Structure formats: C-alpha cells, structure tokens
Amino acid sequence: SPLRGLPNLILTPHIGGSTQEAQENIGNFVPGKIINYINTGGTTNSVNFPNLQLPILENAHRLIHIHHNKPGIIAHINRILAAHDINIVGQYLKTNETIGYVITDIDKEYNADVIKELKEIQGTIRFRVLY
C-alpha cells in the first residue's frame, strides 16, 4: 500500500470479524489500545510498531522518543538528561528493523531547553512529553 511509506502515519491492524459479537469486541479492543497509548505510551500488540508494555508511573514524568533505529540514540538522550542533572527512574526500549521507541521516566521537573535538545537529536521522528 502507498500509505506504508508516508511519514507520521501509524497503521492499525485489520481484525476480521463479521458477527455482532466480533464487531462489539473489535469496537472495544481498538479504542482500548489507543487509549492505553495516549495515557501510558504502551504499544502492546502493535503490528507495525515496537511493542512495549509499561508499568504505571507515579510521581515522575514520562518522555516518549520515537526515532530511526540506529546506534547512539539512547546514549544521546541520556547525555542530555545527565547534562541537566535529571535522574532517570526507568527507561524502556523496543525496536524493529527501522523504528526505535524509547520511554524515559524522570523524577524531576524539566525545562524547555531539555525538551528542545531531545527533539533535535538527529534521527528523531517524534518526541512528546506524556506527563
């Protein structure tokens, strides 16, 4: 499909099912996965994106970094955080052939400079602060 090559596009799996029960289950399954991603960053059961199941986070901030899968990205993220004296309380990485997905939980406030530097890492596809 030509859609596969578009940047900033996440394709969702097709779940075949034509019965009323299957349609109801699909109607609950897909929104639940989207809500989980929005609220936690988790990508469990993703078909075309690295799968991460994340713990519930309390008293910290969660940073989401999606990047091209190449060496040195995690080291670069960690150097930026260390330079700003920010402690990492949890870090979760999963990759596929082309995409790297890292979630970094930090234990203190951050400033706009940190966010700017993380967004500017070469190879970054998307970065966001979850909370």
Question: What is the meaning of each model-derived region?
Answer:
Residues 44-131:
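A conserved regulatory-domain signal marking ACT and ACT-like small-molecule sensing domains
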Residues 1-56, 101, 131:
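Rossmann-like dinucleotide-binding domain for NAD(H)/NADP(H)
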